[in-house]
Amino acid sequence: MTGEEVKEPKEQQEITEVKEQEPEISYNAIVLNGVGGYDKVKVEVKKGVPTLKSDEILVRVQACGLNFSDLLVRQGAFGKHHSLGTECAGVVEAIGDLVIDRKVGDKIIMLNIDGGLWTELVVTTVNRTFLMPDGMSFQEAAAISVNYTAAYVMIYDFANLRPSQSILIHMAAGGVGIAATQLCKLVHDVTIFGTASPSKHETIKENGVTYPIDYTTLDYAEEVRKIAPKGVDIVLDPLGGADDSKGFGLLKPLGKLVLYGSANQVTAPKRSSLAAAKVWWHKFNIDALQLINSNKAVCGFHLGRTDPDHVAEVIRKLISLYKEGKIKPKVDSVWSFEQVGDAMRHMRNTRTLEKSSWSLKSRQLMPQLEIKSVSKRQG
């Protein structure tokens, strides 16, 4: 060969030019770099399209729910291998060849107790998704699966709420508290006691609480006894420590105490050994004979330990209730991905659970994706 320039075929030049013009796909994901304070939560830019199997779907996330459990995950309460984000809502971007009951463009609710949903693109299986009903916003959709499912199981499965009974809902202005109140109102003539700071009393009354109680300056047990000397039929307790014993003491015979959290441990951005020790020191203990003699029941609830098929059944019931106008998720505020630390700080500073439902709003500026490894179905 001489020193003459070797030219590429015209077809090869065109392919090269097209490749150079293709935008690089990237998306944001919130990750946990260790456990501890707010500095451990970071926004990372991921490059490329997530791999999709034939039985999976790719979802472009529009909103993510922030729950109290995410604060505990950040603090390391569940170990070092848990991921943030258990619920979100978005639009189906692509589907695998074997998927027949979802299509591109479907708006869906997504739940994954193992976390990992705080990302703009997520791959999941169909059984973890539920079609959004007409009229539901993405923020509402990202606020229904955890709080309302937890409240539904505790009230109807564990406590078996019946007409003319009474219930104490701690942190009634919180995500679970709002959901529990609305679900209690579906049963005839239920008396609802709800604890909240004074600034939230009007809100929880509008939501259905019969008797708001200021837990910040008053003894809530004494306040309940003033109105219901015999106590209440049900106590929903997310607090832990001494409040568990207090709640048990408030029960009528045949009453039920449902424990589902330990909010008293979250007193600072980082996990507090002192707070944990205080909760442990005041932990609720009762033996079988004492329980029999008390004529009461104690239940412990963990959404992650609930049968997935039952969870799916409950979510479908909740969607039906939403369609009927019987429940309505309340979104307190919307934050961008970059504000995740501020959102967590705000949740803790406003008495942790004392929120409605939160959303982390993802950006909507990503280019349209072209997924060639799976079939897209527009039907």
From Swiss-Prot:
Organism: Tetronarce californica
Entry keyword annotation includes Phosphoprotein: yes
One of the record's GO cellular component terms: mitochondrial outer membrane
Record PROSITE patterns: QOR_ZETA_CRYSTAL
Miscellaneous notes: Synthesized in the neuronal cell bodies and transported to the terminals. Each vesicle contains approximately 28 molecules of VAT-1.
InterPro entries assigned: ADH-like_N, GroES-like_sf, NAD(P)-bd_dom_sf, PKS_ER, Quin_OxRdtase/zeta-crystal_CS, SV-ATPase_mito-regulator
Top-level EC class as recorded in UniProt: oxidoreductase
CDD domains: MDR3
Cell compartment(s), UniProt: Cytoplasmic vesicle, Secretory vesicle, Synaptic vesicle membrane
Biological-process GO terms, alphabetical: negative regulation of mitochondrial fusion
SUPFAM superfamilies noted in UniProt: GroES-like, NAD(P)-binding Rossmann-fold domains
Protein name: Synaptic vesicle membrane protein VAT-1
Transmembrane segments: none
Expression sites (tissue/organ): Cholinergic synaptic vesicles.
